[in-house]
Every structure is written in structure tokens, then in C-alpha cells.
Amino acid sequence: MSKKLIIYTDGGSRGNPGPAASGVVIKNKNGETIEEFGEFLEDQTNNFAEYTAIIHALKKAKQMNADEIELYTDSKLVAQQLNRDWRVKDESIQSLFVQAWNLTHEFDKVEISHVKREDNQEADAVVNKILDKHT
């Protein structure tokens, strides 16, 4: 039997670059939150923070023995890059892209979708809570 997780990720930077944080909310297939975490990232860009959130989310999902992932991000850039619709031109995030891309192949199925910011409020709240604590 497959284990499906629904994941919302967000990354934010106050200043871009500036104090940054990543946020992750993991839900079971019924939409119940089962994990919520984030990380303060010092001086980074939004894109760095977005990719960091996705990498941490996928690593956690692997630890939770998931084999199917629905991942939602409010970063159109990151979603399009991971879906191979857009190239990664920024050298500073190429290694993060590769790391995230490789992690997606450790699951039977991964769907990455762009959502509007208002549909990603829980992950955004994790980011803002961390940034408020550190800035």
C-alpha cells in the first residue's frame, strides 16, 4: 500500500538577500497536518530559501517512508524549474536544484504544483514565525 503525503513549502527573505527562512507543512492524504518545521537561513535569497524548504521536505518525507508526494509551493520559478519547464539560469541555486531534483527520484510519484500565496498560508506562517524570532 502506498503512503501519500501532501506537502506545502515556502521560503522567504527580508531584503532578498537578507535574513531568510524555510517553512514546511506536511499533511497526510486526508489533509491533516502531521509535521510542521522550518529553519533560519541567515542572509539568503527567496529562491535559496524556497529550494531549501523543498529539500528538507523531501528528506523528511523519505524518513516518513512516503512513496507518493504532492508538493505545493508559491514560487512559480521553483515549480517551473523542478517540472523542467524553465531552465535554472542562476548559478547560485543550481546545486540546490540538482539536490531537489535528485530527491524527487527517490519516490514513486512526485507532483510539484505552483499555488497562489493565499493557498500557502500555513507554510508562510512557519517562515514568518522564524523570521520574526530572528529579526
Cite the ranges covered by each PLM segment.
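RNase H-like nuclease fold core
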Residues: 2-48, 59-63, 67
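Residues at secondary-structure transition points
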Residues: 43-48, 52, 88-91
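RNase H catalytic domain
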Residues: 12-16, 55-127, 131-134
